[in-house]
Amino acid sequence: MSAFNEERVLGVHHWTDRLFSFTTTRDAALRFSNGHFTMIGLRVDGKPLLRAYSIASANYEDHLEFLSIKVDDGPLTSRLQHIRAGDTIIVGRKPTGTLVVDYLLPGRRLYLLATGTGLAPFMSIVRDPETYEKFEHIVLVHGVRKVDELAYHDLLVEHLPSHEFLGDIVSSQMHYYPTVTREEYRNMGRITHLVESGRLCADLGMPALDPAHDRVMICGSPAMLRDLEHMLEQRGFAEGNTSIPG
């Protein structure tokens, strides 16, 4: 059996000239946990050209969704950015990853801290009803350079809170905090500074980050991951994995 499925592109949305998302069909046998990533790509000269992409859609949806940057000289993204509805892409059969709520210890508040396309796995997690059963508050922070890079802003602000099944719990438990670094906006600053200064929690009316009650997931640039990991470790947070919850 092949390690990949061929899926048909259903739609493509170009957020900016550097950012796009797309949906595809989903093989009925594909199973994944919200927060997982999988290998996706295109066939080039008869061979698969693949990269790891987080799945932005929830695991109960009948389609798959992915969020991607555009890199003109990127081996895959230089081609992927030109896909259209009806095109075929390759999707791995074995999604995996550690950004899964089940790998966290119980807590009161879940912080999801993302920069850029690091938002993708958290879009899956905030659409999962079980997330709201495990935590009283879910704080989704998305840091970008410019306002138009706030992908899924309207979905998070308007559509999810009015969702037929998720609307009530999203409205009462999810706190969306978009922040911008290079343009004027209601929230400004890098996530690392917002966390370190205490401004993030203050703006949200939340207590200071506390490993006794708070759980944190981070996804984004290597520099952001490194800085936040160090910052959180200094505050007493312990990194979890598939065998030891954190």
Predicted regions: what they are:
Residues 2-85:
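Ferredoxin-reductase
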Residues 115-121:
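Ser/Thr-glycine-rich phosphate-binding loops at phosphate-binding pockets of nucleotides
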Residues 2-3, 141, 148-246:
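Reductase modules of NAD(P)H-dependent flavoproteins
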Residues 121-131:
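Histidine-anchored nucleotide/phosphate-binding helix
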Residues 38, 89-92:
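Generic structural signal for buried aliphatic residues
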Residues 110-113, 217:
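Conserved beta-strand elements of the Class I
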Residues 69-71, 115, 143-145, 181:
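Cofactor-binding loop segments of dinucleotide-utilizing enzymes, especially the Rossmann-like FAD-
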Residues 95-105:
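A short, basic/flexible loop-to-alpha-helix module at the beginning of a structural domain
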